[in-house]
Design a protein with these regions (language model features):
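NTP-dependent small-molecule kinase module
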Residues: 143-176
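P-loop (Walker A) phosphate-binding loop of NTP-binding proteins
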Residues: 8
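ATP-binding Walker
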Residues: 11
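Conserved substrate/cofactor phosphate-moiety recognition/catalytic segment
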Residues: 18, 22-61
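A glycine- and Lys/Arg-enriched "phosphate-lid" helix/loop adjacent to the NTP-binding pocket
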Residues: 99-143
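Hydrophobic anchor at the beta1->P-loop junction of P-loop NTPases
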Residues: 5
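Glycine-rich phosphate-binding loop used to anchor ATP phosphates in small-molecule kinases
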Residues: 53-98, 102-106
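Walker A/P-loop
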Residues: 14
Length: 176
């Protein structure tokens, strides 16, 4: 099974992937690691700030990794904010039945109430530079992601009152 975890920055994609690794022993790939490897090795002229260009660039690689893992009957978790909302259009039904997708979304209320906690826990798994992160940016991105998930009928986890994700939702029968 392939599990795709998407969401805005700071929603907990990487820590969720780590917890799933520990629970199910599925390896995970952080799209951020792929991005930085390609940038640092000079295999692209894109920078970490070229989000609009990075989505199609990275997705063209990631979707083929997904296909390869499925063809090899391997389990894999892939997490990152560079998964386009129309990702499912790149796979036929034989692939789609082996892919589970979920987007992590924080509500406006959660962000406003817990912004300092979001900053505090930002580096639990990876080191981050938090100087440029604003509450307004997080609210806008999460609202956009919620709208897109609804538009495409994608599964999402809404983080509203407290940050609690039941990882058992990732059992095969619970996600589409």
């Amino acid at each position: 099974m392939i599990i795709l975890i998407s969401g805005s920055t700071h929603t907990g994609k990487t820590i969720l992937a780590q917890k799933l690794l520990e629970r199910y022993n599925y390896p995970y790939l952080s799209i951020d690691h792929l991005k930085m490897g390609l940038i640092r090795s000079n295999n692209t002229t894109l920078t970490p700030y070229d989000d609009d260009e990075l989505v199609p660039y990275l997705w063209n690689i990631v979707k083929e990794i997904v296909k390869t893992a499925i063809e090899n009957n391997q389990n894999l978790i892939i997490e990152g904010c560079y998964i386009p909302f129309d990702w499912h259009n790149d796979f036929d039904n034989d692939y789609l039945k082996r892919i589970k997708y979920c987007c992590l979304i924080m509500t406006k209320k959660y962000i406003e109430t817990h912004f300092q906690d979001i900053l505090k826990y930002a580096s639990v798994i990876e080191e981050r530079d938090e100087e440029k992160l604003s509450m307004e940016y997080l609210i806008t991105e999460n609202q956009k992601n919620l709208s897109m998930c609804k538009k495409y009928g994608h599964t999402y986890i809404l983080i509203d009152k407290d940050y609690s994700i039941d990882i058992d939702i990732f059992k095969r029968e619970n996600l589409k």
